[in-house]
């Protein structure tokens, strides 16, 4: 692992330019002859705006403190839209929680390979449900599971969603979100988005059967719709789901009577009619191999799973990590983690944290702040810079999630 430390204690929030108090004094004749000169004063606003749009997103906030003119430029709606259109795209960041009972932590920028001190809006503890898409991040509490917030963690803008329908108390819940990427050039800041909730609850007195319901929130109508009410036999829902190309994928887990430990359900959100039962298992997709756990993610509208590969004789014991892409109903292997990286985590449990977007996958062990990245295009594994989060006691857990840093999108 690379041991170089690289982080900045830089709290993220919009920075408002406050002009310093001017100092008045008499100038000498020599001083009066010298005039201050700034190169950017020669540039028209549109050209300066274009130059600033090539800065990394972390530098945009610092640019706003240079002078009033720069602050007005980087705060304008036109600049925010142009910045998001810039060919020098921002890669997804990874947020790592500092402690289990605090929403603060550090965010990692893989382009300049630096960590930033970062506070999240809305969320209270690290065990909340998290889902992200196109700059927006959804948070849902892990207790009552009825407090849902949608936010832009960079600008700190957020809103509260109304309580979803269905069982008030569930055994398992999976949340995902998707921002409508169609017509991106038009009204980028107010693009519509959806939030899905998959609820799973055991049928009273029957461990073999589980009630499962799917609920979808639309930001356009600001309402929830119940899409599916079904009863699964021998399977239950879990906490893993994602939306790709308007198809909701979520993992299900065997409760006995199946050769598969895990499975995948695909539900087309645009073709589901009135809530009905018996339809979910028709779209069952088996896992690529025996997995200890699986993490679903949307990478450029492709469904990707990062899974722990179990031993042949002991499938619950992890021996490696693989990455697959779903094509139709078949899994195509993209990569397997080299053993030197797998062993670099130290002790690796059968379950772990992994998330990704664009073409970048993050993998993190719950027992260590070490963070590994995998570039899907370059097929390249790389450790992140050392995170400033340190392990303070043996049973301390580490977790996090990735999101796209965007300035222009609002919940």
UniProtKB/Swiss-Prot annotation:
Pathway given in the UniProt record: Protein modification; protein ubiquitination
Kelch repeats (start-end): 81-135, 137-178, 196-246, 251-299, 302-350, 352-401
A GO biological-process term: protein ubiquitination
Domain F-box as annotated: residue spans: 37-83
Entry-linked InterPro entries: At3g26010-like_b-prop, F-box-like_dom_sf, F-box_dom, FBXO31/39, Kelch-typ_b-propeller, Kelch_2
Superkingdom field: Eukaryota
Domain commentary: The F-box is necessary for the interaction with ASK proteins.
Name of the molecule in the record: F-box/kelch-repeat protein At3g61590
Organism: Arabidopsis thaliana (Mouse-ear cress)
């Amino acid at each position: 692992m690379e041991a170089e430390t690289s982080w900045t204690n830089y709290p993220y929030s919009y920075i408002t330019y406050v002009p310093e108090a001017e100092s008045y004094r008499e100038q000498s004749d020599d001083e009066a002859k010298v005039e201050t000169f700034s190169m950017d004063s020669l540039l028209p606003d549109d050209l300066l705006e274009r130059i600033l749009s090539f800065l990394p997103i972390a530098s945009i906030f610092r640019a706003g403190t240079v002078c009033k003119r720069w602050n007005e430029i980087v705060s304008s709606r036109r600049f925010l839209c142009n910045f998001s259109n810039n060919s020098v795209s921002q890669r997804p960041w990874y947020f790592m929680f500092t402690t289990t009972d605090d929403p603060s932590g550090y965010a990692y920028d893989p382009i300049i390979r630096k960590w930033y001190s970062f506070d999240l809006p809305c969320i209270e503890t690290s065990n909340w449900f998290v889902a992200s898409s196109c700059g927006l991040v959804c948070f849902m509490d892990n207790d009552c599971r009825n407090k849902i917030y949608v936010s832009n963690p960079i600008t700190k803008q957020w809103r509260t969603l109304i309580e979803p329908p269905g069982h008030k108390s569930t055994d398992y819940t999976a949340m995902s979100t998707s921002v409508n990427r169609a017509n991106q050039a038009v009204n980028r800041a107010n693009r519509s988005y959806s939030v899905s909730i998959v609820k799973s609850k055991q049928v009273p007195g029957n461990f073999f059967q589980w009630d499962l319901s799917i609920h979808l929130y639309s930001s356009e109508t600001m309402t929830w719709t119940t899409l599916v009410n079904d009863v699964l036999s021998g399977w239950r829902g879990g906490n893993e789901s994602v939306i790709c190309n308007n198809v909701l994928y979520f993992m299900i887990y065997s409760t006995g009577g199946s050769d598969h430990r895990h499975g995948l359900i695909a539900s087309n959100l645009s073709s589901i009619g009135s809530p009905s039962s018996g339809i979910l298992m028709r779209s069952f997709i088996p896992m690529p191999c025996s997995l200890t756990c699986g993490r679903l993610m949307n990478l450029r509208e492709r469904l990707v799973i990062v899974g722990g590969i179990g031993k042949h004789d002991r499938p619950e014991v992890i021996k490696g990590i693989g990455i697959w892409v779903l094509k139709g109903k078949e899994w195509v292997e993209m990569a397997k983690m080299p053993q030197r990286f797998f062993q670099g985590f130290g002790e690796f449990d059968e379950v772990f944290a992994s998330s990704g977007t664009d073409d970048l996958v993050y993998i993190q062990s719950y027992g260590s702040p070490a963070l590994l990245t995998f570039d899907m295009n370059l097929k390249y594994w790389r450790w992140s810079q050392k995170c400033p989060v340190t392990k303070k006691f043996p049973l301390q857990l580490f977790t996090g999630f990735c999101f796209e840093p965007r300035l222009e999108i609002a919940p």
